[in-house]
Structure formats: C-alpha cells, structure tokens
Amino acid sequence: MPRTQRNDNFIDKSFTVMADIILKMLPANKKAKEAFVYYRDGMSAQADGEYAEALDNYYEALKLEEDANDRSYILYNIGIIHASNGEHAKALDYYEQAVDLNPQMPSALNNIAVIYHYQGEKAKSEGNTNEAEALFDKAAEYWKQAIRLAPNNYIEAQNWLKITGRSEMDVFF
C-alpha cells in the first residue's frame, strides 16, 4: 500500500491532501507529478524514521525528476539520511551534488561544514593536528558560503569562525 494511503496522523494526512490538490492544479507533466509523489512519500517515510523506505522513494524520484532545483532537494534529503546513519562520505557526496545543482542551498553547505568539523574534531582527538586543521579549514569555507546566503542563520558557526580566527568578516549579519 502506498505511504500516502496509510498516513495515520492528522498532520501527515493534511499535508498529503494539500499536496495532492496542489499537484492536480500544477501544469506539470505526468513524469514530474510521479516524481513529486515519490518525493512526498520519501519525506513522509523519512519523518517517520523509515530511512530505507525513504531512500527507495527518493531514488525513484531521482529517476523521474528533470528539474535541477527539485533534484537538488532530493539529493539533499538523501544526504541527510546517510549523515544520520553515520555514512559521512556518502552524505558529503549527495550534499555536493545538491550544491552543484543548486548553489543557493545554505542548508546543504552547512551540513557539509558540520561533517568536516566533526571529522576535524575526530582527527584532533586522535592527535592528527595537521589533518584536523585542514578539515577545520574546509568546514570554515563551507560555513562562510552558507552564512553569506543566510546571514541570520548559523550563529554557532559564526561564533566558531570568529573564535578560531577563520573569519575575515567582522559581522556576518
């Protein structure tokens, strides 16, 4: 049974009904509508913690979706799932693909920075100072890009950049 037919909470049902109405009104072709259904089902499964099901839906959506901007959000969500499963290399790959298609996606840039920062902290704790600094520098570059796009967001990253001397800007916002 499709996920849209088994939503049992009010918010999911409301979202599904609204999405179906919008989908019917949009002048999209059949392929685009089908891609959206897979994407919507992927988001619903992801919200329920059903990551394997979400990935299946996202991969199907990717096969059908032609719009670069829409593809970027599918790739971004796949990255989120891989990151939450601790698969950082896969997550980075999907986030990078999302940014390649949509350079105006600060959330993907932030998530890339978070992974590099995490890897830097891990390298630092293992005594690999040079590797840690290189990873921290990568994190800084991605955070700067994210902050330029969304200056009122990522306050902790802004503070980290200032504290570590990796910010050439006095004020981001």
From Swiss-Prot:
Each TPR repeat, start to end: 35-68, 72-105, 120-153
GO CC terms: plasma membrane-derived thylakoid membrane
Domain of life: Bacteria
Swiss-Prot/TrEMBL GO biological process terms: photosynthesis
Pfam families in the record: TPR_12
Membrane topology summary: Peripheral membrane protein
Location(s), subcellular: Cellular thylakoid membrane
InterPro entries named in the record: PSI_Ycf3_assembly, TPR-like_helical_dom_sf, TPR_rpt, Ycf3/AcsC/BcsC/TPR_MFPF
Keywords annotated in UniProt: Membrane, Photosynthesis, Repeat, Thylakoid, TPR repeat
Primary location recorded for the protein, binned into one broad class: membrane
PROSITE patterns, A to Z: TPR, TPR_REGION
Keyword Membrane: yes
Repeat among keywords: yes
Gene3D superfamilies: Tetratricopeptide repeat domain
Function: Essential for the assembly of the photosystem I (PSI) complex. May act as a chaperone-like factor to guide the assembly of the PSI subunits.
Protein family according to the UniProt entry: Belongs to the Ycf3 family.
The protein's name: Photosystem I assembly protein Ycf3
UniProt lineage: Bacteria, Bacillati, Cyanobacteriota, Cyanophyceae, Oscillatoriophycideae
